[in-house]
Amino acid sequence: DVDYDPLPAVADARAALAEDAAPVHDGAEHNLLAEFDMAFGDTDAAFATAPHVFRETFHQHRGGGHSIECRGNVATYDPLEDLLTLWSSTQTPHTARQLLCDMLGRYETGVRVVAPELGGGFGPKLIFYPEDITLAVAALILRRPVKWIEDRREHFIGTTQERDQFWEAEIATDGEGKILGLRGSLIHDHGAFTARGVNLPYESAITVTLPYEIPAYAMSVKLALTNKVPVTPVRGAGQPQGVFAMERLLDRAAQALGLDRAEIRRRNLVSGADMPKTKPLQNRGGGPVILDSGDYPKCQADVLARAGWDEFPARQQAARAEGRYLGIGMANFVKGTGRGPFESATVRIAPSGTVQVE
């Protein structure tokens, strides 16, 4: 028989940050995992003098990778070669090997990680899970192959997820829809444990400013622990959340100002003549946020022309007459890539005296 004692739990990141919230971890004084601010320009002045200010609250709910094949591992140990081999549905076999070496006190030559076809990864399979080390230890002890395949129910409660952010944001514009300032607060639900630090909300807080000209910006970010599955990168790694917040704010402003949604974006996009454009922010690799090339207004115009944006209202009305409802939306997204600064090299010296550099 198993006796269960119900314990207090928090499932809402906002409630988790309340002073009287039950701590997720025993001995912890609160559930605030981390907090930071991002800012440039004078937001107070921008909002104090702005003809228009639009405020919105967003909850971006949780989601997961939910690949066709769940996670799985097979571990074997060859005592003759003193070689531990782990076949794992991991997206990061080199990281997994290094972690196994660190945890088991083994040299890299004594650990091999093989990543076969994954059946879908999408981010959650970047993570090193307890099952990875558990199977490795079991194979070393038993001297037998050990296999574990995650079922779908386990996947929903044991594999990391993403999103789950609460935004309170406001945008200041002039009478023509030009952005004067952006500010707000972001609460990020981190789940019960941390596997990737602050990188997800950090990316969200950077991406919300792209690819528009924003003279002043301020965002307060808090990471909350909750009694939920941990949060790690999934398909975009924090960046879609920032895009969603900005694009919805622009839709709201366009509606209130009587502007076409595409036009308000065109008026605020960074122009090709201003490239490369350095944003006064720091990416998570420590370098500056640089929009290195492109003509964003032209890119938007080309896409809208191919999509038939100007002709869509006529199509919409024709469909409405037939009892059908058609809608169209748009968004601009600049994907951050090439982050650093980090490189690696391996030098191997064989007994024969030859040197191999990788």
Locate each region found by the language model.
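Structural alpha/beta core scaffold segments of enzyme domains
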Residues: 1-358
